[in-house]
């Protein structure tokens, strides 16, 4: 293990030292069509989206068993470091560099943020500095692999996880971002609408989570049908609040300016999430369950996921329906996965995968002026085709990447390590769970 970390350290040191020899000229700002209000809002939005990753750490960390809180939180939190370095080197170029037939960007277009300066970009960021656009997009790349971690919580090796998220970011996330958000991307040219990442972020994370749950297999506690109590439900509530707050930057910030589209996205975000939260707890109550804080939090997040692709394209009433529909479908899926003995630990696929799918389909239905609801079929049909392509690519590609990772380093901890808990066996950090004097 020390050898693998030595190699990782050497690679990081090499990348960081490139700056001593490779220091592209940073152009002075010359753009005159930049609105300071747009810059102020996008700086704020970038900070809000960054907050979502620590929020996700609390959200996931509170759901797992006490012996796995730290490991689960760290798996989300560490993406802030890993993905940032990767994105500066190649990730941004793969997402938004010179397009190769609408499939992927040239990895050297913006190597080490070359040419990413304080001026606007004519197609990608005509109203804000290109550097600000890149930093905003970086936050999306950070949280996407973090979302996956909930599916294989309590049983994945940390070093294997680090390798997988690097591969995922390069071979899954970057192509999807290019297809969908680059002006030359083929999904973008088809007219497929993804305002803030329902497809790029949530569907990709959901399908990668599904593949991960299948390949890593179920936990021992799941096999033994042991009920695992959430470690800290207040953590879950705190994480939900941080996610909800950050999501305003996620969705409204995707307007790339302080404008009326941002206002609409802000409003639809809060409305859809509220509808989804209430739908989840009422639906649970109808089925004989007690109204729970966990249910309210999960429902709220499902609504946020579902409205993400539609936030700037739909009306307030349609946002209510999108949140409601996604909540019911995800709730049913959580129950259904247990029947198939699928140990997706924190229900990532039912919540993010299906939430993103519902949002993508209903965006094709309700998108103002071009949706099925307004008498147009083209956008809706392309959304269905895009859904098929993205589903096959993300699930199949992620499955292959897990297998490749397994060839390099085992994905799963040993049975004894799982029993002892990953906080101790992977990180050597544990809560004191016993009273002083107890063995």
Regions picked out by a protein language model, each given a short descriptive name:
Residues 1-439:
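Hydrophobic alpha-helical transmembrane bundles of multi-pass membrane proteins
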């Amino acid at each position: 293990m020390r050898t693998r970390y030595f190699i990782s350290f050497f690679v990081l040191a090499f990348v960081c030292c490139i700056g001593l020899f490779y220091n592209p000229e940073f152009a002075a700002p010359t753009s005159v069509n930049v609105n300071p209000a747009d810059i102020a809002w996008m700086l704020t939005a970038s900070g809000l989206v960054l907050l979502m990753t620590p929020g996700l750490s609390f959200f996931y960390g509170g759901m797992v068993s006490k012996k796995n809180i730290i490991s689960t939180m760290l798996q989300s939190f560490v993406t802030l470091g890993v993905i940032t370095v990767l994105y500066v080197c190649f990730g941004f170029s793969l997402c938004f560099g010179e397009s190769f037939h609408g499939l992927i960007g040239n990895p050297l277009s913006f190597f080490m943020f070359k040419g990413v300066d304080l001026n606007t970009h004519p197609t990608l960021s005509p109203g804000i500095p290109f550097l600000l656009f890149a930093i905003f997009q970086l936050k999306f790349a950070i949280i996407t692999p973090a979302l996956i971690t909930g599916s294989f919580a309590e049983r994945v090796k940390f070093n294997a996880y680090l390798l997988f998220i690097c591969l995922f970011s390069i071979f899954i996330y970057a192509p999807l971002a290019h297809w969908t958000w680059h002006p030359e991307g083929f999904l973008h040219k088809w007219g497929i609408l993804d305002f803030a990442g329902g497809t790029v972020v949530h569907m990709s994370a959901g399908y990668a989570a599904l593949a991960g749950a299948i390949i890593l297999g179920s936990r021992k506690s799941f096999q033994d049908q042991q009920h695992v109590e959430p470690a800290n439900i207040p953590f879950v509530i705190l994480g939900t609040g941080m996610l909800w707050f950050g999501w305003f930057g996620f969705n409204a910030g995707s307007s790339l300016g302080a404008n009326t589209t941002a206002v609409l996205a802000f409003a639809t975000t809060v409305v859809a999430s509220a509808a989804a939260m209430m739908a989840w707890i009422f639906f649970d109550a109808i089925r004989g369950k007690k109204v729970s804080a966990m249910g309210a939090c999960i429902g709220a997040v499902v609504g946020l996921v579902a409205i993400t692709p539609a936030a700037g394209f739909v009306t307030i009433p349609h946002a209510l329906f999108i949140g409601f529909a996604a909540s019911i479908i995800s709730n049913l899926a959580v129950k259904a996965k247990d029947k198939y003995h699928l140990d997706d630990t924190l229900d990532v696929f039912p919540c993010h995968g299906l939430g993103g799918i519902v949002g993508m389909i209903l965006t094709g239905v309700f998108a103002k002026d071009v949706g099925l609801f307004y008498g147009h079929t083209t956008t809706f049909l392309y959304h269905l085709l895009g859904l098929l392509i993205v589903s096959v690519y993300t699930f199949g590609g992620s499955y292959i990447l897990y297998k490749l990772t397994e060839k390099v380093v085992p994905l799963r901890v040993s049975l004894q390590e799982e029993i002892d808990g990953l906080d101790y066996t992977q990180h050597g950090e544990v809560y004191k769970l016993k009273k002083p004097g107890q063995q």
